[in-house]
Amino acid sequence: MNFQQRLQSLWTLARPFCPPLLATASQMQMVVLPCLGFTLLLWSQVSGAQGQEFHFGPCQVKGVVPQKLWEAFWAVKDTMQAQDNITSARLLQQEVLQNVSDAESCYLVHTLLEFYLKTVFKNYHNRTVEVRTLKSFSTLANNFVLIVSQLQPSQENEMFSIRDSAHRRFLLFRRAFKQLDVEAALTKALGEVDILLTWMQKFYKL
C-alpha cells in the first residue's frame, strides 16, 4: 500500500469521528480536539514516528503506544461498566480469545477492531456528549484506525484454515453482540475494551 492509499484508508475509517462541514458551532467545539488528535496520529504514523510495536503473527503495527490506549479506557471505564446491567453475558468470551495462534491473531484482531470501528464506535459516537468522555473515546477509536490500517492479513489459499478459524471466533463474538439489545450491546462492547487490550498486549514487543 503506497502513501496515498494509506492516507485514503485512514481517512475513510476515521471520517465518522470528525465533524461534517455543516456542523453547528457547539458540535464543532465538541469534536475539534479529537479530530486534531487524529490528524497528529495520522501524521506521526505516515511520517515514520514509532511507538511500541505489535506483532500479530506476520502483521506488524508501529506508531501505537499501548499506555495511551489504557489511559483512554481508564478515563471512561467506570462510566461504561456502571451502565452495563447485564452481568451474566460476555461478548469477548474465552472461546474468542483463548489459545489464538500468532498466525491467526492478525485475522482476528483485524475483524474485531473493524467491528468496533464500524459498529460500536460509530453508533456510540453520537451518544457521547461529555467532552472528557468524547476525548477518551476518540483516542481509542483513532488508535484502532491506525492499527487496522497497518494490518494486511494474507489472503493466500494456504492460509484458508487459519483465516476460517479466526472467522469462527469472530462469529462467536458477533453472535453474542446481536443477542443483546442495541444499547446494551454497545455499552457492554465498550466496557470490555480492557479484555481486548489485555489480549492485544500479548502481541506487543519492545
Swiss-Prot record:
GO biological process, one term: cellular response to interleukin-4
Keyword Amino-acid biosynthesis in record: no
UniProt keyword terms in alphabetical order: Apoptosis, Cytokine, Disulfide bond, Glycoprotein, Isopeptide bond, Secreted, Signal, Ubl conjugation
GO cellular component: extracellular region; extracellular space
GO MF entries: cytokine activity
Signal peptide span: 1-51
PROSITE patterns found in the cross-reference section: INTERLEUKIN_10 (PS00520)
Ranges that cross the membrane: none
Induction: Upon influenza virus infection.
Localization, UniProt: Secreted
Tissue spec. comment: Up-regulated in melanoma cells induced to terminally differentiate.
Major location (coarse): secreted
InterPro entries per UniProt: 4_helix_cytokine-like_core (IPR009079), IL-10/19/20/24/26 (IPR020443), IL-10_CS (IPR020423), IL-24 (IPR020444)
Glycan attachment sites: 85, 99, 126
Statement: the UniProt record of this protein carries the keyword Glycoprotein: yes
Cystine pairs: 59-106
Cross-link (Glycyl lysine isopeptide (Lys-Gly) (interchain with G-Cter in ubiquitin)): 122
Post-translational modification: Glycosylated.
Family membership noted in the UniProt record: Belongs to the IL-10 family.
Task of the protein: Multifunctional cytokine mainly produced by T-cells that plays a regulatory role in immune response, tissue homeostasis, host defense, and oncogenesis. Possesses antiviral functions and induces the type I interferon response during influenza infection. Signals through two receptor complexes IL20RA/IL20RB or IL20RB/IL22RA1. In turn, stimulates the JAK1-STAT3 and MAPK pathways and promotes the secretion of pro-inflammatory mediators including IL8 and MMP1. Intracellularly, maintains endoplasmic reticulum homeostasis by restricting the eIF2alpha-CHOP pathway-mediated stress signal.
Protein name per Swiss-Prot or TrEMBL: Interleukin-24
Native source species: Homo sapiens
Organism ancestry: Eukaryota, Metazoa, Chordata, Craniata, Vertebrata
